Swiss-Prot record:
Residues binding ATP: 431-439, 457, 503-509
Residue ranges occupied by any FERM domain in the UniProt entry: 39-359
Active site per the UniProt annotation: 549
All copies of domain Protein kinase, residue ranges: 425-683
GO annotation, cellular component aspect: apical dendrite; cell body; cell cortex; cytoskeleton; dendrite; focal adhesion; glutamatergic synapse; growth cone
Traits of the deletion mutant: Mice are born at the expected Mendelian rate, appear normal and are fertile. Mice display increased bone formation and high bone mass, due to defects in osteoclastic bone resorption. Osteoclasts display defects in actin cytoskeleton reorganization, plus altered Rho activity, microtubule stabilization and podosome organization. Mice also display increased differentiation and activity of osteoprogenitor cells.
Family to which this protein belongs: Belongs to the protein kinase superfamily. Tyr protein kinase family. FAK subfamily.
Pfam families in the cross-refs: FERM_C_FAK1 (PF21477), FERM_M (PF00373), FERM_N_2 (PF18038), Focal_AT (PF03623), PK_Tyr_Ser-Thr (PF07714)
Changes after translation: Phosphorylated on tyrosine residues in response to various stimuli that elevate the intracellular calcium concentration; this activation is indirect and may be mediated by production of reactive oxygen species (ROS). Tyr-402 is the major autophosphorylation site, but other kinases can also phosphorylate Tyr-402. Autophosphorylation occurs in trans, i.e. one subunit of the dimeric receptor phosphorylates tyrosine residues on the other subunit. Phosphorylation at Tyr-402 promotes interaction with SRC and SRC family members, leading to phosphorylation at Tyr-579; Tyr-580 and Tyr-881.
One GO BP annotation of this record: neuron migration
Modified residues (Phosphotyrosine): 402, 579-580, 722, 834, 849, 881
UniProt-recorded name of the protein: Protein-tyrosine kinase 2-beta
Length: 1009
């Protein structure tokens, strides 16, 4: 049908929230209507869901139901959004999918008339009903700001029309702007620099698809790298825009290319002779356009129109006659078809209702008896609230008028029946209030007569139909779950008011339980809770279900040793798909993974992230994650690599496991099956540690109780004598007992040969007095031997003071020797010392201890590298030596500045090291041709080793930056220093290799005297 302007539409973009008002209205179907007169219309509309089952609504009606009733019922249902003020802007379009034939349905037409007039022309399944915005206010930009739902709906409609009709025709610059505006609006929580990350952009490309935002032709014409850079740069320009600002910017940009507020029809004006014109109909009235270069000429304003009539002509043509106030004759417009004339008539009539004083229809129809009527009955003038009230009063609660196509992915066959009679449940006190309604404590009497304490979730009476479906979706999912650590569903009452009945757990939410009992809960118990929730999540993983809301507030405590996961209101089955795309805006941002915040993408991997946050909550005794941040700031922190800090009582191995779960790349996170094994090991380890600590607490070391006869402190008992084991060790006969070094230093009596009689002469040892040694009979306090008198206690006290003085003197000596050893080790770690020192190091003698030879040389620590002195050669014009020294200075600068620099400046000092290394390797490459071939292999190998050292230093730097705010920060800095030291040592080894090769080639000279 030529000349018919197809309205704008789009299916998959938008952000529409459901209202929280009165219940959804219903189109009343009289009880006495025969079955053949009942119809079910599938009306498509625009929504934010990628699930096709969410983009339409089935409306049950009769052949006598008017189109206006269907439109109003959908608007009041809340399916497209809340608080619609401009209801008169909406219309219903009937479109034939195979031929693009279009019919705009007048509000006063009945369903029966539509079927008799239009649907009979083609197969019924080939027709589609679309809810569209067709009539716009005069200043629609400002008017739509007052009605956010209509604004977003019109935007979605326009976006769809742009992608279908204009995207391939606009310039690349405009296509880039419009695509990035939609990116900013659609991913409104994404930070401005999110697309700079390669992983984020790949996720957008593969999982979401650039086809939603940019025309395919543009993607094919540009190189991928160039296209990506253009998107990143353009996106930065719109990063600060809010959703409404993106929409308005889109309108203004596209308006420069196409008319977004009017429809154009190619037709003929009949004025004695026929003039072919483009008739432009929009908020400004009816205008004609004779050529593209001229301005439109106004033919009539909508306030001037008094009547509209369509008359068929021969050869499928038709005439549209408009009666205009003050004009001697009507304005006659000749169209190519009757359908086109009727579509124009509906458009003009709609604008007359919107802008004119007369709210009824101006279209005149011929009756069967030949009589004319001036107009059809007026459309009811009730506003939305009054009509909502009127419809609610006229509808029966039990009537089954609206029915969504059931989501079969949420309804699984088999399993027990959960229907419960309301009289079997008695409600008691209110436990709390949820999003949908109150939660009650109650008692359920089952078929055996047993009384069971239950929790009853209720749904508010004024909840919309869509929210009721969401409320019931939790029960639908819980029907299929059976796990010892998942809340058990008892039953469902689907009749109004809807109830969901579940097990009652007296200890309540885990978050409150942790806060109340934080002084008594031990670490093994906390780890046990995490293990149990992990097992529940592994079960959900096995049935392809994502939870999306794992937090302590959604975990219930069944007993002090058992917790259960609940609240499946956000859960979804993902079936064979890899992920679930969220369409709601009420999401727990501080618990979510980066891909969930940026792209609303939920997978098992995002559940792993949330589970790790939940573990952090448990080990923090219920603290909220990122409680020091606002929701909008969380993604920026995560993008920088920052993570939650280690809780005080969290075992380091468990925190390491958490950080693995917080990997930015979802594919690098562990699965729940792996986490169950790891947590089981950690739990067993913590249990063993707790048992050992308890055993140590029971067996305390011996102590002397204070005598009651005096108030002075009692003397400390001397340490029990150690008797070595007999030499009949069956496992290792030659193995001797060795006292640990740390114990020797603090307890010299244990290693004194005078006080360790051998098994041979121990029988001839003279008996010891009571005040010299206390023999310990048991570890109980009441068995300790008390001194018999104050004098004996005083002697013990003096003897202990003498021994303590000897211990302190011996420890001071050892401290001096240890400090000397530490200084030598520090000199070993400083490459500058060995490169400039031409004599081997010797232990220094400390004044006052000349006779003391010191302890034997301690073995080198693991990882310490042996550094030899640099050759004593003439270094004049020696670029290799000069560059090595410069590199070492850069390493020392890194060592000295690392503690004071912020993490973002680490790259400056590391870059300085890298530049100096490049100069060093360049100078060696210049010298290499003059060196013997036999030496080149070693030199080239050392060069490769230096490159690896630099790569390791860079990796350690990145690790230190990522963990700057965590408890691992200092450890990461130490690793960074170790990597830099290794690089400096290998640089010195390269210098030695070059010096040796120069000696072989007779290129080296001794230093000038």
């Amino acid at each position: 049908m030529s000349g018919v302007s197809e309205p704008l539409s789009r299916v998959k973009v938008g952000t529409l929230r459901r209202p929280e008002g009165p219940p959804e209205p219903m189109v009343v179907v009289p009880v006495d209507v025969e079955k053949e007169d009942v119809r079910i219309l599938k009306v498509c509309f625009y929504s934010n869901s990628f699930n096709p089952g969410k983009n339409f609504k089935l409306v049950k009606c009769t052949v006598q139901t008017e189109i206006q009733e269907i439109i109003t019922s959908i608007l009041l249902s809340g399916r497209i959004g809340p608080n619609i003020q401009l209801a008169e802007c909406y219309g219903l379009r009937l479109k034939h999918m195979k031929s693009d034939e279009i019919h705009w349905l007048h509000p006063q037409m009945t369903v029966g008339e539509v079927q008799d007039k239009y649907e009979c022309l083609h197969v019924e399944a080939e027709w589609r009903y679309d809810l569209q915005i067709r009539y716009l206010p005069e200043d629609f930009m400002e008017s739509l700001k007052e009605d956010r739902t209509t604004l977003l709906y019109f935007y979605q409609q326009l976006r769809n029309d742009y992608m279908q009709r204009y995207a391939s025709k606009v310039s690349e610059g405009m296509a880039l702007q419009l695509g990035c505006l939609e990116l900013r609006r659609f991913f409104k929580d994404m930070p401005h620099n999110a697309l700079d990350k390669k992983s984020n952009f790949e996720l957008l490309e593969k999982e979401v698809g650039l086809d939603l935002f940019f025309p395919k032709q543009m993607q094919e014409n540009l190189k991928p790298k160039q296209f990506r850079k253009m998107i990143q740069q353009t996106f930065q320009q719109y990063a600060s825009l809010r959703e409404e600002e993106c929409v308005m910017k889109f309108f203004n940009t596209l308006a420069g290319f196409a008319n977004i507020d009017q429809e154009t029809y190619r037709c003929e004006l009949i004025q004695g002779w026929n003039i072919t014109v483009d008739l432009v109909i929009g908020p400004k009235g009816i205008r004609q356009l004779t050529s593209q270069d001229t301005k439109p000429t106004c033919l009539a304003e909508f306030k001037q129109i008094k009547s509209i009539r369509c008359l068929p002509l021969e050869e499928t043509q038709a005439v549209l006659q408009l009666g205009i106030e003050g004009a001697p004759q009507s304005l006659s417009i000749k169209t190519s078809s009757l359908a086109e004339a009727e579509n124009m008539a509906d458009l003009i009539d709609g604008y007359c209702r919107l802008q004119g004083e007369h709210k009824g229809s101006l279209i005149m129809h011929a009756k069967k008896d030949g009589e004319k009527r001036n107009s059809l009955p007026q459309i009811p003038t009730l506003n939305l609230e009054a009509r909502r009230s009127h419809l609610s009063e006229s509808c029966s609660i039990e009537s089954d008028i609206y029915a969504e196509i059931p989501d079969e992915t949420l309804r699984r066959p088999g399993g027990p029946q959960y229907g419960v009679a309301r009289e079997e449940v008695v409600l008691n006190r209110i436990l709390g209030e949820g999003f949908f309604g109150e939660v009650y404590e109650g008692v359920y009497t089952n078929h055996k007569g047993e009384k069971i304490n239950v929790a009853v979730k209720t749904c508010k009476k004024d909840c919309t139909q869509d929210n009721k479906e969401k409320f019931m979706s939790e029960a639908v999912i819980m029907k299929n779950l059976d796990h010892p650590h998942i809340v058990k569903l008892i039953g469902i009452i689907e009749e109004e008011p809807t109830w969901i009945i579940m097990e009652l757990y007296p200890y309540g939410e885990l978050g409150h339980y942790l806060e109340r009992n934080k002084n008594s809960l031990k670490v093994p118990t906390l780890v046990l809770y995490t293990l149990q929730i992990c097992k529940a999540m592994a079960y959900l993983e096995s049935i392809n279900c994502v939870h999306r809301d794992i937090a302590v507030r959604n975990i219930l405590v069944a007993s002090p040793e058992c917790v259960k996961l609940g609240d499946f209101g956000l859960s979804r089955y993902i079936e064979d798909e890899d992920y679930y795309k969220a369409s709601v805006t009420r999401l727990p941002i501080k618990w979510m993974s980066p891909e969930s915040i940026n792209f609303r993408r939920f997978t098992t991997a995002s559940d792993v992230w949330m589970f790790a946050v939940c573990m952090w909550e448990i080990l923090s005794f219920g603290k909220q994650p990122f409680f020091w941040l606002e929701n909008k700031d969380v993604i920026g922190v995560l993008e920088k690599g920052d993570r939650l800090p280690k809780p005080e009582l969290c075992p380091p191995v468990l925190y390491t496991l958490m950080t693995r779960c917080w990997d930015y790349d979802p594919s690098d996170r562990p699965r729940f099956t792996e986490l169950v094994c790891s947590l089981s090991d950690i739990y067993q380890m913590e249990k063993d540690i707790a048992i050992e600590q308890e055993r140590n607490a029971r067996y305390r070391p011996p102590k002397i109780l204070e005598p009651t006869t005096f108030q002075e402190p009692p003397p400390k008992p001397s340490r029990p004598k150690y008797r070595p084991p007999p030499q009949t060790n069956l496992l290792a006969p030659k193995l001797q007992f060795q006292v640990p070094e740390g114990l020797c230093a603090s307890s010299p009596t244990l290693t004194s040969p005078m006080e360790y009689p051998s098994p041979v002469n121990s029988l001839h040892t003279p008996p010891l007095h009571r005040h010299n040694v206390f023999k310990r009979h048991s570890m109980r306090e009441e068995d300790f031997i008390r001194p018999s008198s104050r004098e004996e206690a005083q002697q013990l006290w003096e003897a202990e003071k003498i021994k303590m003085k000897q211990v302190l003197e011996r420890q001071q000596k050892q401290m001096v020797e240890d400090s000397q050893w530490l200084r030598r080790e520090e000199r070993c770690l400083d490459p500058m010392v060995y490169m400039n020192d031409k004599s081997p190091l010797t232990p220094e003698k400390e004044a006052g201890y000349t006779e003391f030879t010191g302890p034997p040389q301690k073995p080198p620590r693991l990882g310490a590298q042996s550094i030899q002195p640099t050759a004593n050669l003439d270094r004049t014009d020696d670029l290799v030596y000069h560059n090595v020294m410069t590199l070492v200075e850069a390493v020392l600068e890194l060592k000295n500045k690392l503690g004071q620099l912020p993490p973002e400046d680490y790259v400056v000092v590391v870059k300085n090291v890298g530049l100096n290394l490049r100069k060093l390797i360049g100078s060696v490459d210049d010298l290499l041709p003059s060196l013997p071939a036999s030496s080149r292999t070693e030199i080239e190998g050392t060069q490769k080793l230096l490159n690896k050292d630099l790569a390791e230093l860079i990796n350690k730097m990145k690790l230190a930056q990522q963990n700057a705010v965590t408890s691992l920060s200092e450890d990461c800095k130490r690793q960074m220093l170790t990597a830099s030291h290794t690089l400096a040592v290998d640089a010195k080894n390269l210098l030695d290799a070059v010096d040796q090769a120069k000696v072989v080639a007779n290129l080296a000279h001794p230093p000038a005297e």
